[in-house]
Amino acid sequence: MPASLVVGTQWGDEGKAKVIDFLSKDTDIIVRYQGGANAGHTVVVHGKKYVFHLVPSGVIYDQTICVIGNGVVLDPLFFIEECDRLQKEGFPVFDKLLLSDACHLLFPYHSQIDSARETTLSQEHKIGTTKKGIGICYADKMMRTGLRVGDLLDTSYQTRLKHLVDEKNRELDKLYGMPPVSYNDINEGLKFFLSKVKKNIINTAYYLDTELKKGKRVLLEGAQGTGLDVDFGTYPYVTSSNPTTGGALIGTGIPFQHLKHVIGITKAYTTRVGEGPFPTELLGEAGEKLRQKGGEFGATTGRPRRCGWFDVEMLKHSVRINGITSIALTKIDILSDYDTIPVATGYKLNGKTLDCFPSQGLDKVEVIYEEFPGWKSDISGICEFQKLPEKCKNYISALEKWIGVKINLVSTGPDRKDTIHGDSF
């Protein structure tokens, strides 16, 4: 059975968790492949909201095994807190969760250094990090100095950890004038973490390959989106990993032959958190109106998201990079009650129309817009395409034509049931 991938096409917060939740009922295994606790996935089931940061949202389904892949950076105590919270809400997390032995561990010194670096930068050089230590942990991974989950299975890790803590404390003191972190506190935390998850630690790449060959249905989920990819996003205003298709394969160990479906998730408008260029951004009252209508505040930090119109060039870029085979369009209901809805269909730079989404100079482009007549009726909760207002259907059809990929799922509200899918079109 081939694997499927859900990937964000914008700057994250596209509604991946809802789509993953919708697809989970037909899935045996869900795998998180990159990122860390800097991401928040929100799922609403029967009016109750659940927020996930590290644990795959498929944990709420009885039949689904959840896997944390090798591409994730894991804050061990935050992870246990999240698992315990979900256990109290009735989900047997520890009975259905597998953890890659190659997953890198994130420690307090990572977040402290991250926060210190961001604080010392001038406003024009700030990245807009969540200060969770994600990038610093990935840097240690690339420097080959980090500790992995599997290292904890041998007590010799303590020698390496002591050396790392001493090194990071020197950095905290000499560069940032910050107090040291405690080796003993970190080590005791790791012992507690291991006592909870030791039986869950395995070679997940081998496990996934074995299960796929048995015909199991596997769904890959990431954090953030293509616009935040460290290689193909709006660098340097990006995350420190690859949320794109290539990152999914590396972050799970699944070979490309197993991957057949790549589902791109996109909002019917655009948002981003933090710094960086945003060509279609709405400022002032217009931006605030869309933010309030869409409830655009970060699930992890609570930060207000910047809001703007749909960007076709960005979506075409995401389709190319990820090999997207279908699109799920979310939050179309938020656009109700607009007289007109502009869509960015291209860019000009120095008077010349660009062929594609640029790697540099996005902050200097002139946006080419086409306007669509809006619809006034409330479409929240509609589950059949034909019941949508004609102007809404025209908007969706135009996006599909420009993107060049079939839109076969439309979300009309936060709940699982507020979804138009498949035969409804």
From Swiss-Prot:
Catalytic activity: IMP + L-aspartate + GTP = N(6)-(1,2-dicarboxyethyl)-AMP + GDP + phosphate + 2 H(+)
Binding site for GTP: 12-18, 40-42, 305, 331-333, 411-413
Top-level taxon in the UniProt lineage: Bacteria
EC number: 6.3.4.4
Assembly notes: Homodimer.
Family, per entry: Belongs to the adenylosuccinate synthetase family.
SUPFAM superfamilies documented for this protein: P-loop containing nucleoside triphosphate hydrolases
Biological pathway: Purine metabolism; AMP biosynthesis via de novo pathway; AMP from IMP: step 1/2
The keyword Magnesium is assigned to this record: yes
Organism: Leptospira interrogans serogroup Icterohaemorrhagiae serovar Lai (strain 56601)
Protein name: Adenylosuccinate synthetase
Keyword terms of this UniProt record: Cytoplasm, GTP-binding, Ligase, Magnesium, Metal-binding, Nucleotide-binding, Purine biosynthesis
Names of required cofactors: Mg(2+)
